[in-house]
Curated annotation (Swiss-Prot):
One of its GO terms (molecular function) is omega-3 fatty acid desaturase activity. This is Omega-3 fatty acid desaturase, chloroplastic. Its EC number is 1.14.19.-. One of its GO terms (cellular component) is chloroplast membrane.
Length: 453
């Protein structure tokens, strides 16, 4: 059929062209690919349409032929330089600098958050307290009743996590996000924090300092970076306790009594430089409540025996401390990209808060009241914990690249965070003594680190 058609049209079929293979042996340098000059009119019978009264036309095919066949390497290079559709070259976009001032302000973030996210419901807050207290006493009663060594490890993990949940609710009382009633916040906060041996007002005030100076290389209160000069002056034991797991995860009780390296004072001492004179009565009250709880535990030790007290309260307390240190550390450390710390005029409340990290804890997110949703909490600590997730989703378009999506937990438990905190202990050691925007550097002598960064 094709032969008949070409004869009627006065055309000769094109000579077959064998394409250059993309795999296998390439053509030799002497191989030639010839193309038919299709612009030349071929003599022969004219094409006469049967049903249309059209004038005679030149039916030569006007096809431009390539001068040569590009090599595979050249074609690949061409693909790399173009976007594959319209030949526009890719422009190399500037890398995102997390230390650059953001193109938005706090008012922009606040405006993006729905109004109901700012509403505090004391009844809802109290419902979480009731839930957690019932869980704590229920777990203790079940463990004491069963008194089985197969059960005790499960109890310790669960009860330590519930102690941590109680701490988070007391933490909300300290921020005033529990309710608008300051007296209710103080009473509930004292009951919750004293029960797990935390001085409510002493810790509340130092934690307020942490929020007011978050991301500041010198004035931050919680897990602040060590300047190089101070780092070099630490003795070997102190360095090991600070940077070798699991010791940093047991630091909280020590911090309550002596704060961090380079800082002085105690959360129990009303004359500590942590506090101003008009806060001393609050500190005395909290210290008295803490001492009363300690006395109660000593009395229970005489009643039930020290071993039983250790199993019911002591080990869960240690698990709680590890939760607290793990979470508070990872909210400001351990990201795969280096994040800045600021000094001087480069620091601002917004820029410091944007160095905070959200973390995903799997199904424990609900148990410890979404404390992992931490960026919005740091910028606006008055938002109740039960609105943090919604507020964060609303603010993400404003944050842009300044918000870092947390890695999701592939398992019900956040085991993926263990590797991140260990990696941070091995690399995040000190910052430069000078400069207003600084990043963590690594001492190769610690934890087998291979280099000084």
């Amino acid at each position: 059929m094709a032969t008949w058609y070409h004869q009627k049209c006065g055309l000769k079929p094109l000579a077959p062209v064998i394409p250059r293979p993309r795999t296998g042996a390439a053509l030799s340098s002497t191989s030639r690919v010839e193309f038919l000059d299709t612009n030349k009119v071929v003599a022969g019978p004219k094409f006469q349409p049967l049903r249309c009264n059209l004038r005679e036309r030149n039916w030569g095919l006007k096809v431009s032929a390539p001068l040569r066949v590009a090599s595979i390497e050249e074609e690949q290079k061409s693909v790399d330089l173009t976007n594959g559709t319209n030949g526009v070259e890719h422009e190399k976009l500037p890398e995102f600098d997390p230390g650059a001032p953001p193109p938005f302000n706090l008012a922009d973030i606040r405006a993006a958050i729905p109004k109901h996210c700012w509403v505090k419901d004391p009844w809802r807050s109290m419902s979480y307290v009731v839930r957690d207290v019932i869980a704590v006493f229920g777990l203790a009663a079940a463990a004491a009743y069963l008194n089985n060594w197969l059960v005790w490890p499960l109890y310790w993990a669960a009860q330590g996590t519930m102690f941590w949940a109680l701490f988070v609710l007391g933490h909300d009382c300290g921020h005033g996000s529990f309710s608008n009633n300051s007296k209710l916040n103080s009473v509930v906060g004292h009951l919750l924090h004293s029960s797990i041996l935390v001085p409510y007002h002493g810790w509340r005030i130092s934690h307020r300092t942490h929020h007011q100076h978050h991301g500041h290389a010198e004035n931050d209160e919680s897990w602040h970076p060590l300047p190089e000069k101070l780092f070099r002056s630490l003795d070997t034991v102190t360095r090991m306790l600070r940077f070798t797991a699991p010791f940093p995860l047991l630091a909280f009780p020590v911090y309550l009594f002596s704060r961090s390296p380079g800082k002085t004072g105690s959360h129990f001492d009303p004359s500590s430089d942590l506090f101003v004179p008009n806060e001393r009565k609050d500190v005395i009250t909290s210290t008295a409540c803490w001492a009363a709880m300690l006395g109660l535990l000593v009395g229970l030790g005489f009643v039930m025996g020290p071993i039983q007290l250790l199993k019911l309260y002591g080990v869960p307390y240690v698990i709680f401390v590890m939760w607290l240190d793990l979470v508070t550390y990872l909210h400001h450390h351990g990201h795969e990209d280096k994040l800045p710390w600021y000094r001087g005029k480069e620091w601002s409340y917004l820029r410091g808060g944007l160095t905070t990290l959200d973390r995903d804890y799997g199904w424990i997110n609900n148990i410890h009241h979404d404390i992992g949703t931490h960026v919005i909490h740091h910028l606006f600590p008055q938002i109740p914990h039960y609105h943090l997730v919604e507020a964060t989703e609303a603010a993400k378009p404003v944050f842009g690249k300044y918000y870092r999506e947390p890695k999701k937990s592939a398992a019900p438990l956040p085991f993926h965070l263990i590797g991140e905190i260990i990696r941070s202990f091995k690399t995040d050691h000190f910052v430069s003594d000078t400069g207003d925007v600084v990043y963590y550097q690594t001492d190769s002598k610690i934890n087998g680190s291979s280099k000084l960064e």
